[in-house]
Amino acid sequence: MPADRLGAHMSIAGGLHLALERGKTTGCSVVQLFVKNQVQWAARPLTDEDVRRFKKARRTTGITEVFAHSTYLINLATPAEAEWRRAVDAFADELGRAEALGLRFVVIHPGSHKGSGLEAGISRIVAALDELAGRIRGYRVRIALENTAGAGHTVG
């Protein structure tokens, strides 16, 4: 890894591997990307070919430091049980995708407590992270919580 690092969030349009090629073209040594469409819950599974192309692009571009960012739909702080369960399951899927790609971190905004209060929101986040820790036991990928400006009911 170069001493001077420059990174950007790159589009995965056309394939995950293309995000690395776009990063290289723009002079990046670090790239952040989504491991699936950032505004949809559903995603087709990663294929062996997707993973092979991505790992090859890491080698050929020299961009070895790649961070994933979770989709914007995931809200680990929500008080609504069905929404919380869907968020935890979706984030577990994204962590699995990142693991398959050999990524070290998935960045996530903790979410919004939607008026239930900061303490309640933090409790929901902790419960989600506890469950996820069990579900990703043995994975190398880690969760990186990204702070927010704290507007409205956001936590972090």
Predicted segments, located by residue:
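Active-site acidic/histidine proton-transfer and metal-coordination neighborhood
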Residues: 76-156
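N-terminal pre-domain/capping segments
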Residues: 1-70, 74-93
